[in-house]
Amino acid sequence: MVLVGRGDGVATGKFGFPSLAGEPAFVLHAGIFRGPAMCRPHLMRSDMTPNPIIERPEQYRFHNGTKAVWPFAVEEYEDRVAGLRDIMEMHGLDAVVLTSMHNVAYYSGFLYCGFGRPYGCVVTATECVTISAGIDAGQPWRRSHGDNITYTDWARDNFWRAVASVTGLGKAVGVEADHLTMERAEKFNTFVKPKRGMDISPATMVQRMTKSAAEIALIKQGAQVADVGGYAIRDAVRVGAREIDVAMAGRDAMEMEIAKRFPDAEYRDTWVWFQSGINTDGAHNPVTSRKLKQGDILSLNCFPMISGY
């Protein structure tokens, strides 16, 4: 960290991250990240020459490694996308932009982790492409049935530019209206410029409600995993045990069982709701460190999350 005087007695911070060339690849100056493409006269190399302006892409494809084993067979995803294309044809849509976790995962197999960043899946008559942030590198492509485009952070709204690169401009496009905020809906109109838009969420919901044989088989295994968690909780219940201890016993047992049954899956979000005594008065009261007492009412819920199911 280098403190740089402004000449008025106030110090500002400048923080440089070294690049492969040995110079700062990014500079934080006055609270703003700037890189070589946004150089200002005061951002100099060590030899006092200006940093060069570097072209930065809006998007790229990072197909790192090989495709992973998806939650379902290729044929399952092909059937789902074919069903969506039937809906598109029925309503005269050229493309559909999916943005919710459940729809992106349902049609592509990729269960994203947003952390404040937009993710999506664009389906056209010929393509099924997930759109992901650079921070996730090659994982979205490996976990997607279909192609993947990575958008960069060099400019605001590169997500929507990546979306538009697949949908094309001036097309009839379906979106999940119940998932788009007013801000994102405005960005969709600005960057995709649809000649006609349609809320596709009711139709996709109906499609997802009809479970395939493969989905039913997975859900049955999930119920069996929940039983494993329930038995572990029963064994952990005793006077003096904390709610958190009991909940962790059930969660750990379920995660181990999921890993045994689904060795190629990604493991996330499995959890237990365990409440005791006064904490049972609300359905969504969080787990606490309250110690169990004789005569307590106990409430437990096991949530084994297997690829979003």
Model-identified regions with their sequence ranges:
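Short catalytic-site patches enriched in acidic/histidine residues
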Residues: 104-114, 191, 200-206, 210, ...
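A composition/biophysics-driven feature that prefers long, compositionally simple stretches
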Residues: 39-229, 287
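Generic secondary-structure signature for well-ordered alpha-helical cores
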Residues: 193, 221-231, 235-242, 251-259
